[in-house]
Amino acid sequence: IGAVNSIIEERRNNGPFNDIFNFMERVPSTSVNKKGIEALAYSGAFDSFPEINRGSFAMDAGKGETCLDLLIRYGSLYQKTAESMKNSLFGGGDEIETVRPPLPVLPELDQIEMLKKEKELVGMYISAHPLDRFRFEIEHFTTMDLPSWNDYVDKVSASRNREDFDKDQWIAGLVSSVEVKPKANGNGVFCRLSIEDFKGTTSFVLFDKDYEAVSGYLRPHEFLLMRVYVAPRYKSSGDKNNKVLEISGGRVKIRSITLLANVRESMVREMVIDMPLERIDAELRKNLKKAVSRSKGKSRLAFNVYDRENRINVEFVSRKYSVLASDELLRWLDAAGLHYRINK
């Protein structure tokens, strides 16, 4: 809080910071340490400064220093010089002359690395969410988000009705942590898996064959579509001559996993584009043909032509084109105001 207040106060009193060097010159080095500046850098606080980007701060600047180390040393030297001149016989009225060190110009961090840094240093994603590029897959191929899944697990686990169990649900998320540890008895291992989506998190504990079946997918920062269900737990009751198995709760199981990056090619069987009859003309047909030809794939393409006035619709299947539900095609359909359906 003290560091933030120090930055805000300096900006309020003396105006906006002109560049990264101006920031280092003006903000007291005793108030904002290296960790604080690093957090500001990777959360995007300096993105408006053209002379540096987030990738530059960790770059080797020579002599065992990073760019951030170089900037901190520069700021500290500048402020010590300013303080020395202020207390000198000359009264500090002269302008301080310094040579600003050159900064390496690097490509910006890729988005995944940038977002990982934001989460690591700030505790949240700021610029975007890593799952943003999979919104299509999540919208069309999941049955619930993770908070809803957690509620579903609690509800089913509390049931004593056998019919409530073993029903497949589809969830998606980013793997946030994977811990593999030996079992207490020393016989094999177990895995604690945590994933997150836009709204929350959930976790799994996997043993033996359940873990082995999906272990190849369980890597931090992997994007997964998971088919999951709640299996019943049983306990026995009654005496030794008349034992009865009763449901005593539930346990989460993973039926299968697919990489979100593969969903469009492997799971989109058909795309149906709804087309109102009154909008179909030569221009629309020409533009639609261009959009479809740029997104060739393996999914069947169909058109549902409907007449609102007479309440009639006819579906046509394209024999010439198969498509991939690419971002480019989806953006064009949205811009054209055409609704589409997947696997329906």
Please place each PLM-identified region on the residue numbering:
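Single-stranded nucleic-acid-binding OB-fold domains
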Residues: 34, 50-51, 130-267, 278-286, ...
